[in-house]
């Protein structure tokens, strides 16, 4: 049986097309994916992301626990409210999930994890927490709303009290503060500025309606996917999973290798993989007509000029750029060109760094893009 967020009736009343997303009935769009996408790039849009899982961790040794559990190092989080992005790995170095962790207070951290991996995540965390005396509290009482776009923060700020506005003023990216009943974080999944706001479920409908009245457009999963793809952000189950190393998913920057004595889960496997030259994740741009899709095979050449193959992990038409873009897993060291066959035609691709649009601006040169380095 599919689950519903507390905002389900609101979505239906606003004309959303609802679909089953990993067991949750979620809005795909409210009439126009393209208009919703452009609203986030040019103004402000909002997403119900209450299907995601919020987990609070408590304990005297909770920091030690997370330094063991996560590939990134929460020792970097010294200021309450600061957050970081990390992979949670298995012993083989595969990605169980990618998540955001917040340092809330002494002996208290908060995780926000994916809905599709909820049960596996909770089981994995629960398996390793007892050795550190950590208490796990899933926050089913909270809803989560993402407000994204160049005017998102100012539109939300206008709804806050003067005291609340002062508390969130000047917050840098990847930071969160509890302001009254709202936990407001400067995070997102679109490549735009904005907030992700956790709040009690019994306040969510009224707050959503306030956001609508403030001129913020409701957006669905379809726009969320094209926005994150333009931003070069991974989607669990496509760019990475339990069989794929973060080194092959453009997540090497999230691995904290220092200090060398920190023995996080999966470290030994990653150290072995480093010497084996794992695959890499690249961006693709196709300027000819056609749409790149996940699962397509691409042809390319390796560092020695020999033919090799890669696989598209995510692909779509880019509403911002007006052409097709994709993320693809390929051998290390390929050149700046690749090819794909669509409907019997071999079409040329430019190989670029993952990430195509940020803050509404193209990261791709108008002519042939610069090739990805090793």
Swiss-Prot record:
The keyword Lipid metabolism does not apply. Its EC number is 2.1.2.10. GO terms for cellular component: cytosol; glycine cleavage complex. GO terms for molecular function: aminomethyltransferase activity; transaminase activity. Keywords: Aminotransferase, Transferase. Disulfide bonds: none annotated. Coiled coil: none annotated. It catalyses: N(6)-[(R)-S(8)-aminomethyldihydrolipoyl]-L-lysyl-[protein] + (6S)-5,6,7,8-tetrahydrofolate = N(6)-[(R)-dihydrolipoyl]-L-lysyl-[protein] + (6R)-5,10-methylene-5,6,7,8-tetrahydrofolate + NH4(+). Pfam families: GCV_T (PF01571), GCV_T_C (PF08669). GO terms for biological process: glycine decarboxylation via glycine cleavage system. Belongs to the GcvT family. The glycine cleavage system is composed of four proteins: P, T, L and H. The glycine cleavage system catalyzes the degradation of glycine. This is Aminomethyltransferase. It comes from Edwardsiella ictaluri (strain 93-146).
């Amino acid at each position: 049986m599919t689950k519903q967020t507390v905002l389900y009736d609101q979505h239906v009343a606003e004309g959303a097309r609802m679909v089953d997303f990993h067991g949750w009935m979620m809005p795909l769009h409210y009439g126009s994916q393209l208009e919703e996408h452009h609203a986030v790039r040019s103004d402000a849009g909002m997403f119900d992301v209450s299907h995601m899982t919020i987990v609070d961790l408590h304990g005297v040794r909770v920091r030690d626990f997370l330094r063991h559990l996560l590939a990134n190092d929460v020792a970097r989080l010294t200021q309450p409210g600061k957050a970081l992005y990390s992979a949670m790995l298995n012993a083989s170095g595969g990605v169980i999930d990618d998540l955001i962790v917040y340092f809330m207070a002494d002996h208290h951290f908060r995780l926000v994890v994916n809905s599709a991996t909820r049960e596996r995540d909770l089981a994995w965390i629960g398996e390793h927490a007892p050795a550190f005396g950590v208490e796990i509290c899933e926050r089913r009482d909270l809803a989560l709303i993402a407000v994204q776009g160049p005017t998102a923060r100012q539109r939300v700020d206008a709804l806050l009290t003067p005291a609340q506005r002062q508390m969130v003023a000047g917050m840098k990216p990847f930071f969160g503060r509890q302001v009254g009943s709202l936990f407001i974080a400067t995070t997102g999944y679109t490549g735009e500025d904005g907030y992700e706001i956790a709040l009690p479920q019994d306040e969510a409908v009224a707050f959503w309606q306030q956001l609508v009245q403030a001129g913020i457009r409701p957006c669905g999963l379809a726009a969320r996917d094209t926005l994150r793809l333009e931003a070069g952000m991974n989607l669990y189950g496509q760019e990475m999973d339990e069989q794929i190393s973060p080194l092959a998913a453009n997540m090497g920057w999230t691995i904290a290798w220092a200090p060398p004595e920190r023995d996080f889960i999966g470290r030994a496997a990653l150290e072995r993989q480093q010497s084996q030259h794992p695959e890499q994740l690249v961006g693709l741009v196709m300027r000819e007509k056609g749409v790149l899709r996940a699962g397509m095979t691409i042809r390319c050449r390796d560092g020695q000029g020999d033919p090799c193959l890669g696989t598209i992990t995510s692909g779509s038409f880019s509403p911002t750029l007006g052409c097709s873009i994709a993320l693809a897993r390929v051998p290390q060291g390929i050149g700046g060109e690749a090819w794909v066959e669509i409907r019997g035609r071999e079409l040329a691709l430019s190989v670029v760094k993952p990430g195509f649009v940020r803050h509404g601006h193209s990261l791709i040169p108008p002519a042939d893009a610069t090739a990805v380095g090793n």
